Amino acid sequence: MSSKVEHPAGGYKKLFETVEELASPITAHVTGRIPVWLTGSLLRCGPGLFEVGSEQFYHLFDGQALLHKFDFKEGHVTYHRRFIRTDTYVRAMTEKRIVITEFGTFAFPDPCKNIFSRFLSYFQGLEVTDNTLVNVYPVGEDYYACTETNYITKVNPETLETIKKVDLCNYVSINGVTAHPLIENDGTVYNIGNCFGKHFSFAYNIVKIPPLQEDKEDPINKAKVVVQFPCSERFKPSYVHSFGLTPNYIVFVEQPVKINLFKFLSSWSIWGANYMDCFESHETMGVWMHVAEKLTGEYLNIKYRTSAFNLFHHINTYEDHGFLIVDLCCWKGFEFIYNYLYLANMRENWEEVKRNAEKAPQPEVRRYVLPLDIHKVDTGKNLVNLPYTTATAILRSDETIWLEPEVLFSGPRLAFEFPQINYKKFGGKDYTFAYGLGLNHFVPDRLSKLNVKTKEIWVWQEPDSYPSEPIFVSQPDAMEEDDGVVLSVIVNPGPGQKPAFLLILNAKDMSEIARAEVDINIPVTFHGMYKKA
């Protein structure tokens, strides 16, 4: 997976350019042959507006939400996109300025207000963004765009129209939830978010939304908290981006990147800050891993500990003979990776991009093994006896279990991120293949397939081409785990090229099957899904 590709032309900067939405879908030019069974839609979310008037957004996660769709039908492809009409977006367009504070951009008070009105606005409480730019997922028969706050946005997956804003606080006890819900084959949705727990201390709640029932009532009305994980620090919850789920267990990784609650509550009301200003790193905490029983909600009081890392994406979690196997995309150390994702850094010339990345934590794909059956007589021993992994779990005299991982992939400044698997058939189960977006000094420049058993790697890469998260789509008559295709949106700013295309790869060997080119630029997208016709 070692990349020799350099990017001196800086074509990656096209990922962070504002674009216009489309009034109607446009037809893509297809080369190659699209599988006849591929009939459906690829839905993607990401930022599409990086400034409002003369005011710039500063962080990668600040731009206004743009919903994308590639439609497949009888070998033809169309592309459509529309801005999500969130309150944040509508007010910004109306007032021609940034109105609501985003992840890394503070929204200054309306300059037209008098001093007294502006003073009062500081003390009217936190106005949380509903800029749902990160992901899109189904709940029952509906589809929602999401970010990491308490707001999700119901959208029409056919027309991309915005339907309504939903505040999850009206249904369950959470302050916000991740943009990485895990969805079971029956349609049950699980997610995790932080909340106030017992004795006014923070905790982390697992929220369950059931599938659509015979009464056709909106499943969100039936959402409930099924598990609560404790917080290691009363007023400093950890940042959580994803979690692990098996048929019988839920895994939560508590990392040393913390949200300072006092700073968070005072930032808007007193000193004017953004979300990024409220994060801090706990340099001595390391990482705590928590496990609960999925069916009963019982928290297992087993103290799993390991050295510090940042975590955003779980690859997969499964059970094997009394152990939980937890595969993660890690960044070594306690420093917050998001510190390196300001747009000014991402838009630098290539040599400066590399210099900035040299200072950042190193990426690594790791496998941790968590023993579930603990006996105190085993103090000092490695409790892992699975023959296929070098990961260890040592029971210490203080009754903590110290975990050391098996490294599945590591490359200098080369990350395997935004992982995807054949989730329908292998989510929460023993599996072999993961697909990832390759980041070269944070620049996405390749697509990779990883065999987690043998560590073999397959790569798709072309000069001056910048992919998105790969989406695996299984073929209808699949006999093997990797029978299917991989879909990715490619920005391609090289001379004589179409600005962007949808790439279709053979999921077995990562060879190109087809591409569907469009005559317009497509900015960066974060996450999405394939919706069958």
Swiss-Prot record:
This enzyme's EC code(s): 3.1.1.64, 5.3.3.22
Coiled coil: none
Cofactor: Fe(2+)
Location of the protein in the cell: Cell membrane
Entry-linked InterPro entries: Carotenoid_Oase (IPR004294)
Binding site for Fe cation: 180, 241, 313, 527
A GO BP annotation: retinoid metabolic process
Catalysed reactions listed for this entry: an all-trans-retinyl ester + H2O = 11-cis-retinol + a fatty acid + H(+); lutein = (3R,3'S)-zeaxanthin; all-trans-retinyl hexadecanoate + H2O = 11-cis-retinol + hexadecanoate + H(+)
Gene Ontology cellular component list: endoplasmic reticulum membrane; membrane; plasma membrane
Pfam (any one): RPE65
Residues with N-acetylserine modification: 2
Annotated cofactor note: Binds 1 Fe(2+) ion per subunit.
Modification after translation, per record: Palmitoylation by LRAT regulates ligand binding specificity; the palmitoylated form (membrane form) specifically binds all-trans-retinyl-palmitate, while the soluble unpalmitoylated form binds all-trans-retinol (vitamin A).
Keyword Mitochondrion among UniProt keywords: no
Keywords tagged on the record: Acetylation, Cell membrane, Hydrolase, Iron, Isomerase, Lipid metabolism, Lipoprotein, Membrane, Metal-binding, Palmitate, Phosphoprotein, Sensory transduction, Vision
Chain residues carrying a lipid of type S-palmitoyl cysteine: 112, 231, 329-330
Function: Critical isomerohydrolase in the retinoid cycle involved in regeneration of 11-cis-retinal, the chromophore of rod and cone opsins. Catalyzes the cleavage and isomerization of all-trans-retinyl fatty acid esters to 11-cis-retinol which is further oxidized by 11-cis retinol dehydrogenase to 11-cis-retinal for use as visual chromophore. Essential for the production of 11-cis retinal for both rod and cone photoreceptors. Also capable of catalyzing the isomerization of lutein to meso-zeaxanthin an eye-specific carotenoid.
Family: Belongs to the carotenoid oxygenase family.
Protein name, per record: Retinoid isomerohydrolase
Gene symbol of the encoding locus: RPE65
